[in-house]
Swiss-Prot record:
Keyword tags: Cytoplasm, DNA damage, DNA recombination, DNA repair, DNA-binding
Classification via SMART domains: HhH1 (SM00278)
Gene3D superfamilies given in the database record: 5' to 3' exonuclease, C-terminal subdomain, DNA helicase RuvA subunit, C-terminal domain, Nucleic acid-binding proteins
Chain positions covered by the region annotation Domain III: 146-203
Lineage: superkingdom: Bacteria
Lineage: Bacteria, Bacillati, Actinomycetota, Actinomycetes, Kitasatosporales
Renumbered residue ranges of the record's region Domain I: 1-63
Protein name per the record: Holliday junction branch migration complex subunit RuvA
Region Flexible linker, residue ranges: 141-145
Segments of this protein annotated with the region Domain II: 64-141
InterPro entries: DNA_helicase_Holl-junc_RuvA_I, Hlx-hairpin-Hlx_DNA-bd_motif, NA-bd_OB-fold, RuvA, RuvA_2-like, RuvA_C, RuvA_C_sf
BP term (GO), one: DNA recombination
Length: 203
């Protein structure tokens, strides 16, 4: 198992980063919030989880070991693959997911694209004894502040979660006032949650 990768960031894409390790570029799939903390040419260390399929090897990257552990635990529930687990962590912090599961907060899970009411109920039952209690007081969405490119990151995140370009455009426009109100440091995680709420209302 590849537990982490460490090295300069060689490339950034809407849903992934390339970290140079020993002269080799390692592609790592990341949430928008993880990507928002990376900068081209700067050193980065990401906890990782390797997902092995018949026709592919995919490395997922996280800000810390706790996020990685939750990513792996989520996949122990039936119907949850790496893409859905990553989508859940794009919308909620690990602690917010623990809190949602421990309190039976169905709405928090339905806020994740790809999870309906019945799916949320099933996940609450299956994950209740697996995620454990919240470790701290983290909010319902990841709050890493970013100073530039929030529109591009948010748009790419929505496309990655399966929304059409038109829907992503409308959602980005809808949350623009919230981003502008935050001044120079809009938080992509909070904007993503607001955008998803907007999309859920219009569907």
């Amino acid at each position: 198992m590849i537990a982490f990768v460490s090295g300069p960031v060689a490339a950034l894409a809407p849903d992934s980063a390339v970290v140079e390790v020993g002269g080799i570029g390692i592609a790592v799939q990341c949430t928008p919030n993880t990507l928002s903390g990376l900068r081209m040419g700067r050193e980065a260390k990401l906890a990782t989880s390797l997902v092995v399929r018949e026709d592919s090897l995919t490395l997922y990257g996280f800000v810390d070991d706790d996020e990685r552990q939750v990513f792996e635990l989520l996949q122990t529930a039936s119907g949850v693959g790496p893409r859905l687990a990553q989508a859940m962590l794009a919308v909620h912090t690990p602690d917010a997911l623990r809190r949602a599961v421990s309190t039976g907060d169905e709405k928090a899970l339905v806020a994740v694209p790809g999870i309906g009411k019945k799916g949320a109920q099933k996940l609450l039952l299956e994950l209740k004894d697996r995620l454990g209690e919240p470790l701290g007081t983290g909010g319902p969405a990841i709050g890493r502040a970013v100073t530039t490119g929030w529109r591009e990151q948010l748009h790419a995140a929505l496309i990655g979660l399966g929304y059409a370009t038109r829907e992503a455009d409308e959602a980005v426009a809808a949350v623009a006032p919230q981003a502008e109100a935050a001044g120079g440091t809009p938080q992509v995680g909070q904007l993503l949650k607001a955008a998803l709420q907007t999309l859920n209302r219009t569907r």
